[in-house]
Amino acid sequence: MTSRRMLRACTHPTIAVMLVLMGLIPTVGSAAAVPPRSPVAGPVPVSYLDLNRYLGTWNQLAAVPQYFNLVCARDTQATYARDPQGNIAVHNSCITWANTVNEIDGTAVVNDRQTGAQLHVSFPSVPTQEGVEGPTNYIVTALGPDYSWAIVTDPTRVTGFVLARAARLDADGWQQVRAEIAAAGQNACLYLTSPTTGGETRILPLCLL
């Protein structure tokens, strides 16, 4: 529900190589080399998400690279608001490498009424993702006690986003975030920092920050 499903994916060869090295794109023969794995339990959501406190604008400070966010050069944001149907209106935006604004609107529906932290996010303009109702693809696995930051992934842990109200986190904040990423069963080295105006300007693995 952040820069997720951003349009016009980047296909630069160096990015493709980076994704191969990070294990996000399988290489020839990799399927035969890796033995089948036992089923792994999905990420655990936070015990309770106060949606009213979660509404508003979030800055993406780091993310696991995906085709839909490679178009973004800096200042990736997600803004959430209640819609007339009682769901959550999603507005994602970023500044592209061409210094233009890339944006998309969608809807989030709460699937887990007990915690409020598992949702289905849809985007009408994206093929196969038009349906407002659907399986969970957005799980809030960690929150700052004051809702100053959040970590989001999906049931397969393929995606990952570090969101914050401010454009930057201090060293203690990043330490907490890395610990929570590990607790969710993910590797902080697969997250790359997302440049923000007034915050981190480099793109580097979160484990090296």
Task: List where the protein language model places each region.
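A beta-rich soluble binding module of mature secreted/lumenal proteins
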Residues: 2-209
